[in-house]
């Protein structure tokens, strides 16, 4: 991404941050405390209640929440906040994370939210202000001279979230569309491109090569940075990851493309159908626009059909430089909902 003169100044010098953070003041109805690693079940239950308003078709699993709180570079007691009501029930949480080892962009992510039945009472404003201060502290602790973004995502169907971010100074920067495809009516898989390409199910021995290919394939994607080994391993070790439903494209022993799949059966009742989620789709640059992504996706959809899944779901950056949206719609995917990526640039 382009580097400005401002970006050449170390973050420690260009970001103003509070020297210390205090917990928000308690009230007659609400109490605040820092997050703990053992809060995963409590926060998962809260996230499920939030999802009814924000994204009714899915919610974070307990394993995903544990992973978020237990990463080596996350300290929930310093980076997280929990709000409870007078009875001790969780009504809001926030987590601030800065992934390690950026190459061209330092990113800080703000996650969390407020139970819909407690919105409109100032909890979200208090939470977001604290998170933003913590994000600035993280940036100001870095000696890197790189562009830096503080980022958060909001669902269009819950406009109060986007309005809250805008009030804090965030701008709507990018749109991500959720697409669905009826597996039974999907177009058949096309042939793999010429050049000795073979498409195989994901296997453990391919894992590191797929991670490297992922980083190469996503190098020119908006907001993307290389995924480290810890993050990658956490992803493929989640119970929802499905190696037999994921596909890898190889030329000799080189990974040139991939599609990863996840299945969370807990989401099926709320969706009204069985589904697989396509998490990552990528081809390394020399193999783009040769039909490889379509062939990989077709192979994955065939695997979904054999597994008895009714629909495939994925999310796509609507302005992706790879033309991914056109690839998906050509296969029979149709848009359903949309999320907005908000950011503040430092």
Which role fits each region the language model picked out?
Residues 61, 185-276:
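Flexible, substrate/cofactor-facing loop regions flanked by secondary structure
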Residues 1-24, 98-195, 340-344:
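Acyl-donor-binding surface of acyltransferase catalytic domains
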Residues 297, 320-324, 341-346:
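Short glycine/proline-centered loop/turn elements that form peptide/ligand docking sites
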Residues 47-143, 151, 251, 256-273:
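Conserved donor-binding loop and adjoining core beta-sheet/short helix segment
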Residues 110, 152-153, 278, 312-316:
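Conserved hydrophobic beta-strand within the GNAT/NAT acetyltransferase core sheet
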Residues 161, 165, 328, 333:
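Conserved active-site tyrosine of GNAT-family acetyltransferases
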Residues 120-137, 280-283, 289-306, 311, ...:
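Conserved acetyl-CoA-binding loop-helix of GNAT-fold acetyltransferases
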Residues 2-68, 191-227:
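Short amphipathic alpha-helix that is part of the acyltransferase structural core
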């Amino acid at each position: 991404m382009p580097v400005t003169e401002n970006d050449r100044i170390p973050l420690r010098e260009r970001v103003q941050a509070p020297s210390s953070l205090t917990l928000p003041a308690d009230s007659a109805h609400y109490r605040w405390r820092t997050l703990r690693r053992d809060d995963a079940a409590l926060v998962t239950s809260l996230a499920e209640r939030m999802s009814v308003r924000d994204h009714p078709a899915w919610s974070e699993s307990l394993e995903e929440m544990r992973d978020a709180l237990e990463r080596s570079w996350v300290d929930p007691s310093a980076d997280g906040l929990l709000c409870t009501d007078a009875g001790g029930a969780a009504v809001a949480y926030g987590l601030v994370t800065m992934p390690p080892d950026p190459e061209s962009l330092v990113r800080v992510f703000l996650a969390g939210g407020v139970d819909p039945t407690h919105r409109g009472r100032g909890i979200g404003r208090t939470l977001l202000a604290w998170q933003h201060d913590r994000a600035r502290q993280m940036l100001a602790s870095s000696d890197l001279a790189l562009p830096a973004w503080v980022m958060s995502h909001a669902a269009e169907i819950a406009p109060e979230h986007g309005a809250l971010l805008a009030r804090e100074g965030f701008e709507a920067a990018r749109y991500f569309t959720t697409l669905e495809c009826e597996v039974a009516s999907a177009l058949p898989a096309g042939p793999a491109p010429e050049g000795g390409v073979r498409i195989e199910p994901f296997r453990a021995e391919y894992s590191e090569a797929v991670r490297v290919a992922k980083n190469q394939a996503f190098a020119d994607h908006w907001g993307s940075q290389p995924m480290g080994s810890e993050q990658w391993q956490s992803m493929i070790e989640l119970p929802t990851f499905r190696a037999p439903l994921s596909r890898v494209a190889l030329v000799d022993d080189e990974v040139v493309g991939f599609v990863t799949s996840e299945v969370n059966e807990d989401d099926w009742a709320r969706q009204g159908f069985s589904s697989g989620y396509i998490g990552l789709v990528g081809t390394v640059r020399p193999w783009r626009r040769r039909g490889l992504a379509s062939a990989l996706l077709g192979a994955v959809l065939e695997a979904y059909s054999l597994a008895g899944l009714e629909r495939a779901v994925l999310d796509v950056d609507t302005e992706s430089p790879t033309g991914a949206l056109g690839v998906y719609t050509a296969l029979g995917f149709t848009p359903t909902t949309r999320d907005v990526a908000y950011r503040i640039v430092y």
